[in-house]
Each structure stands twice: as structure tokens, then as C-alpha cells.
């Protein structure tokens, strides 16, 4: 057979993102046939992915995608093995691709997601897309979780991908305002959206702590009750989203901000890398 040209190797790399040496070896094995070489690489990528599949994935990043025309969005947590890879361009793009896939194709489970035709290249599956990056970087990677929603959405992901938020409201919303609210949730990590959404056992625990602290002052019982009540009011203001002072303007609460914009909070999803065991 004729020698494999550098142009052919580059063309195969452009189509698969596989390392140059792997591309050359695949083209050699396929006698220069580009499509056969792609199949060879896909099989090799799957084999590499399987070998690395048992390695711990303690690092990763959060990615979000919103289609404002279709009023649909998703947030995902992608896992990998090391912090440098979590910040690498191929992994960042992969996480963004998976968020887009979830938003547009609505898979019910991670397994269904992996089996779907990849939205940007339907000839391959989502699992094939992940396997390409695994083969390129040589680390185990996986989709840890995702959440998809429809409606008026906003999102924000921290620059290092460690934390991200997807927020859903009712009403005509300014995208920048929803981004700001999402950023606030990322930074302040509220325990719930509203006071009535806080788990009762958590409220009971905080009340007990507040009363114990109040009793330690040695004040009369009626004063103790007022001190404990004040401590709980402070705790709710620090812990409940709509009662928290807005991070960019603490003269108003997040609830005031949304109400002033004619918006009603429906809910939010906040992901942090590593919250779930890998």
C-alpha cells in the first residue's frame, strides 16, 4: 500500500480528536480507508474507556446549557480523575456538549443518555463522544448526574466549573438578571428557596441551637424567647434564598429583586462537583 500521508493523518485527527499516532496506526491498519480507520479508532476508544472505567473520578466540572428559543435547559456534572483535566479544553467542551445533549434530547437516565445519537454528530453515540476524549486524555470520565427543565431559565457556572446553578422563574425575564440570581445561589448556597421549603428537622435543630445560645446569656425567660426568635430570623435571612440579601446589592433581598422585575421563582438546581460519591 502507499505510505500514509500527513494530510490523511491530520484529516482523521480532525474528525475524531484521536492522538496523531493512533490516527496513523488506524489508517495503516485500514490500508488508508478513512471510514474503516474511524471504525478502528472507535473500537480502540471503547477499549481504552473500558480499561479506565474502574479508576476513581474525584474531580470534574459543572456545565449548563439553555436554549432560550425552545425554553429548555440542563445542568450536568461530568467527572474525571484530575484537576488539570477538569480545566482542559477537551473536557470543558465535552461537559458543555453533554449539557446541550441533555437539554435538547431529554434522556430519562444516564444510560439512556449514553446510548443516544450525539446531537452534533448523529452517526456516533454520546458514549462514543466520551470515549474519544478518554482516548485523547487517557483518564476515566463519566456523567455523574444531570437535571433538565423547561420554561424561563437562567444559569451560572463558576469559572473553574466547580459549582453551577440552573434557575427557573415565571414571567418575562432579563437574561442578565437570571444570571445574577444564579450567581448569587452559586455563592450563597441557600438551604431552600422559601421558608416553607426548609426541612422541619433542620428548623427544629436550629431552634434548639438558638434557644441554647439564648439561655446561656442568663437573661429572664421572656428575654430568652425574644433572643432565640431573633437568632432564627437571622438564620432564615442567611439560609433561605428569597430572604437572603442579594449578593450584588445587599439593600434588597433576592425576593425583592425578583418581585421588582415581575418574576416568580419556580425553583433552582445547584450542583457542586463531588457532592455525590464517584
Predicted regions mapped to residue ranges:
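N-terminal assembly/interaction segments in proteins that build large macromolecular machines
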Residues: 2-278
